[in-house]
Amino acid sequence: MNQTRSKALFKEAAVLIPGGVNSPVRAGKAVGTTPLFIDRAQGAEIVDADGNVYIDYIGSWGPMILGHRHSAVMAAIETVLKRGLSFGASTDLEARLARMVADAVPSIEMVRMVNSGTEATMSAIRLARGITGRDGLVKFDGCYHGHADMLLVDAGSGVATQAIPGSPGVPADVVRHTISLPYNNTAALKDCLDRKGEQIACVIVEPVAGNMGMVEPDPGFLSALRKETEKHGCLLIFDEVMSGFRVAYGGAQARYRITPDITCLGKVIGGGMPVGAYGGSRQIMKHIAPEGNIYQAGTLSGNPVAMAAGIATLSELKKPGVYEALEARTRRLADGLARAAADAGVPVQAHAVGAMLGLFFADRPVTDFASAKTSDLSRFAAYYRAMLEKGIFLAPSQFEAIFVSTAHTDDHIDRTVNAAKAVFADL
């Protein structure tokens, strides 16, 4: 495909923006490409600056579960825009979205809106530390919880893509409180908490690990987290920024029936607008200022445009049959890709949960970050470039999930699988 305009725009952007992008994974370094510059999108399709049309499986990295420019979401935004963008004061939209979130997510009775997933996780950890009076934090290798200093330890997502073990500028004194354990390893968790439980404020986890390429929790892993954190007086935080309202209407905690103490949300609840949230029981959330003394604030938190988009999105997702259709289509894609690879003799591991999909170029099961990193990254890069040439827009990283939306049709899925058949044959 001709990408002359995108390349020219990237060259211009690189003079003004570090790396030419405002989030590192977009740069495409891991797959040997320069980034596409997007002109517009509609439904499940996205159009670049050169006019090339692609079937989109990035979905703005997860938020666009209804597809691009969904009529109900656009109408809600347009209505709010006529009244103003942001007021620095409360609107009824904040409580309306909060009610929808609380009704859907088992762990949430009260919720605080913020502007990003990173804000949500860093605020949730501060809350846990403030409540427990402890500093220790346990996370899991390959789980990415945003770019807050204490969380950039053995992280996934763009950190894994860039092969950066952490980041310069993160003080050693900050990360000394962070312990990172293997995902899906209950023995390691139990041993850690048995030794250091009285120092640990919280355990944070992606219940479905989308930021290492989409790895599902082993049976019993999440229940072990719940049991061990309760035993040692630690708070359990589910980072459902990615999985919330995507693997089920109530998130992974509803799907797996494990209730954490605090839940972090983002992406889908903003309908494509910048948003984040964290919530829990009234007993926990009463500690947040101004009701309590644990401080967190944000100028644009709860802004009306994001709230309106979120309300419209969740209203659509509540309709009967939505998640059944999403899951069926995601499974159709996963099964089709797996069959196409097998027919070509290309070893892959395909995982599907709800409307998320992971495809690893690996010859053995992927259950944690160590096994995810055995993937053939050069083969993935070749696959990515060839699929892009065939009009399939995937995340430019082996360690990112594939997102399916309600706008994807069986025809989109079949065209994607047919493209993959041709690509696998040449890998």
Swiss-Prot record:
- Please name the GO terms of the biological process aspect recorded for this protein, alphabetically: protoporphyrinogen IX biosynthetic process
Q: Which CDD domains match?
A: OAT_like
Cofactors, names only? pyridoxal 5'-phosphate
- The UniProt record lists the EC number as 5.4.3.8
What this protein catalyses is: (S)-4-amino-5-oxopentanoate = 5-aminolevulinate
What are the GO cellular component annotations?
A: cytoplasm
Q: Name one GO molecular function term.
A: glutamate-1-semialdehyde 2,1-aminomutase activity
Q: Which residues carry this modification: N6-(pyridoxal phosphate)lysine?
A: 267
Q: Is the keyword Isomerase assigned to this protein?
A: yes
Known partners and oligomeric status: Homodimer.
Protein known as: Glutamate-1-semialdehyde 2,1-aminomutase
